[in-house]
Amino acid sequence: MFGLSKMLRVGEGRAVKRLKKIADDVIALEADYTDLTDEELKAKTHEFQERIAQGESVDDLLLEAFAVAREASWRVLGQKHYPVQIMGGAALHFGNVAEMRTGEGKTLTCVLPAYLNALEGKGVHVVTVNDYLAKRDAEWMGRVHRWLGLNVGVILANMQPAERREAYNADITYGTNNELGFDYLRDNMVRSLDELVQRGHHYAIVDEVDSILIDEARTPLIISGPVDGSSQWYSVFAQIVPRMTRDIHYEVDNRKRTVGVREEGVAFVEDQLGIDNLYAPEHSQLVSYLNNAIKAKELFNRDKDYIVRNGEVLIVDDFTGRVLDGRRYNEGMHQAIEAKENVEIKNENQTLATITLQNYFRLYDKLSGMTGTAETEASELHQIYKLDVIPIPTNRPNQREDMTDLVYKTQEAKFAAVVDDISERVTKGQPVLVGTTSVERSEYLSQLLQRRGIKHSVLNAKFHEQEAQIVAKAGLPGAVTVATNMAGRGTDIVLGGNADIIADINLRERGLNPVDTPEEYEAAWDAELARVKEKGAELAEKVREAGGLYVLGTERHESRRIDNQLRGRAGRQGDPGTTRFYLSMRDDLMVRFVGQTMENMMNRLNVPDDVPIEAKMVTNSIKSAQTSVENQNFEMRKNVLKYDEVMNEQRKVIYTERREILESADIAADIQKMIDDTIGAYVDAATATGYVEDWDLETLWNALESLYGPSFSAQELIDGDSYGESGELSASDLRKAVLEDAHKQYAELEENVTAIGGEAQMRNIERMVILPVIDTKWREHLYEMDYLKEGIGLRAMAQRDPLVEYQKEGGDMFNAMKDAVKEETVRQLFLLRKQFAVANEQPAETEEGTVEA
């Protein structure tokens, strides 16, 4: 993996030179556009669109379009792209990952490729990590695009389909990876073209690409529906397990995140439930409830792995610290946690549709991304997404100082030292950003700071709505911001305060915003921004004199990249800054990987709790542990992809066929083929061997009766004049006769429907029958594939490759599912014919009865 990383970096020099040449050429065009009036500059958009219509490519227009968007950004936002931002924009346009340091202006960089590619009229998707950033960027950068005559849309949670459709039809659409992925799945569940919201996957720019394509790649997007008969056993075991004792009744492996019930535990549970054998067949489901209840107690911690808000258990992303809205643990785990927290236990769900982010983003014709920390994942981005990482130079030299880690014996001593350090920094007017790994730790530190009377803001999954306001002011003199990993993304910490965001907040407080009141907002913008900048410049100078932003990490993350993201908050745009990590021997990563060795050494040396050590051995051990976890996670993601590749190929077949049915005006030929295939398979199976005397025609006719209802019996066919004496009927004759009969009956159905509603009505009926059948069979297939995957690992014990077995059996199951779709569709359509026949007979009976009366 790391050898490939080195190889990928070899060609970076040439790529950077090429991008620098593009930036120089764009800047050389500046004079051509600065003299244009606003109307003349806006008219360039239509000119570019006309040139594309006449055969020019977006590559041909790159220099001019970038120059126009750059000038428009200056006129609208008061911000002009630096050469390095133009380089980043070009890297994105060519389908790469632009690695740009924190504070280098990735959001403004994105304006250039988004504008250029939107000129094609096929749609550009700008993907962010949360709704707030999607809305902010759509409003903020959308000001430039709208000024240039393009439409900008945003996809937010809880939007109605009509609103989503309008947003996707815009030239540029902002949204989160989850919303885009779920809309794709929902689009492949609709019953008519009018219900579709997306219009294709042309070009995507993924902000924080490492977070979305790497960190979240292990978790598939799942649309699920409730399963009937939710169990009360979750509550029962939520009362039993707290009375059980770890290492007596059960054991826990924190590293593997598994639990095992001991004999003492089994006996205890049997006694509590009043049963003789927990593992008896009739109690087999109880073991799963027990294991989940133990996991909920030992492995899933409130305010770390999840939070409880308004009576609902919400998952917290381990990497970003943000709430994963709409996500639920599967296999009953979420219900076990709900029972533990004594909130409403929601029904278990069955998967209706699913896709991994890896496979969703591979749908795009062109994909690109931005991040400040992609170097450690360059090989994975290349292997899975065919994305090359290009490091973009900083606009100014980096002056950040990264200090050595300090390691304490206990967490209490560590946090006491952290508070002392913060107090010292605040006294001299230096702003401090404190990074924590969980909601629980951030609130614990907040309590310590309150006791010391240190004013501070807390930014975690519970308060994510205030993220922009808190981060915008995190660079003010003496400001203290305690945050989970979420503060590492999306909004710059600017020394002296983020003038753009503070000005925007001030205008919104006056009732102005760029969407609802664009003219009034733009008219007030320049003066408000100038006022905030003037005040901010004075404060920024004070902060620089105090040493710039101080970033303090309270624990190492298992990913080096997350640590680097936190460090990257300091020293933006050439500002001074300092970073340091405070660790303890009881930190999760230290416990899991460094073990007792270091703690024993500290004890032998009689190191007091409040005295830290700075040892190269610790640093190396941490680096080794992080590398080990990264490799492990990479292998897990590759494994997920290998198995999902099987499902992905099947998904593409089903979704393609489904879309063709939706879009086709006439699927009569498809239905006729289904009748041929299904009935033909029935007959072929019954006549595979021997002669008429050997065929089980009774079973065949029962099956045909269930399927469509033949108008003649098997004996009538054998005795019929057309086939001569008994015993002379061939398999092909039988096949032909039954198919002719079926098609004749189907033609009668078509005549009846057409007489009432026209031919279009018949085609609609066929469509309305086949789509639910596909959805039902696909849903059942997903369940069966999940079941297959759960147990496939055991094949390794028989010296068989689980993946190969999964591919083979999954393929067989998929073919069986396709046959089942045909069979059920034919059955449903002929059932409709029978209903028509009954309906046609009923009026005659009624009429006759009336005459008799």
Swiss-Prot record:
Key word RNA-binding present: no
Gene coding for it: secA1
A biological process from GO: protein transport by the Sec complex
Gene Ontology cellular-component annotations: cell envelope Sec protein transport complex; cytosol; plasma membrane
Keywords, sorted A to Z: ATP-binding, Cell membrane, Cytoplasm, Membrane, Nucleotide-binding, Protein transport, Translocase, Translocation, Transport
Compartment list: Cell membrane; Cytoplasm
Pfam families assigned to the protein according to its UniProt record, in alphabetical order: P-loop_SecA, SecA_DEAD, SecA_PP_bind, SecA_SW
Family annotation (CDD domains): DEXDc_SecA, SF2_C_secA
Protein name: Protein translocase subunit SecA 1
UniProt xrefs under InterPro entries: Helicase_ATP-bd, Helicase_C-like, P-loop_NTPase, SecA, SecA_CS, SecA_DEAD, SecA_motor_DEAD, SecA_preprotein_X-link_dom
Protein family per UniProt: Belongs to the SecA family.
EC number: 7.4.2.8
EC category: translocase
List of residues binding ATP: 85, 103-107, 492
Subunit structure: Monomer and homodimer. Part of the essential Sec protein translocation apparatus which comprises SecA, SecYEG and auxiliary proteins SecDF. Other proteins may also be involved.
SUPFAM superfamilies found in the cross-reference section: Helical scaffold and wing domains of SecA, P-loop containing nucleoside triphosphate hydrolases, Pre-protein crosslinking domain of SecA
PANTHER family (UniProt xref): CHLOROPLAST PROTEIN-TRANSPORTING ATPASE, SECA INNER MEMBRANE COMPONENT OF SEC PROTEIN SECRETION SYSTEM
NCBIfam families per record: PRK12904.1, secA
GO molecular function: ATP binding; protein-exporting ATPase activity
Membrane topology: Peripheral membrane protein
Task of the protein: Part of the Sec protein translocase complex. Interacts with the SecYEG preprotein conducting channel. Has a central role in coupling the hydrolysis of ATP to the transfer of proteins into and across the cell membrane, serving as an ATP-driven molecular motor driving the stepwise translocation of polypeptide chains across the membrane.
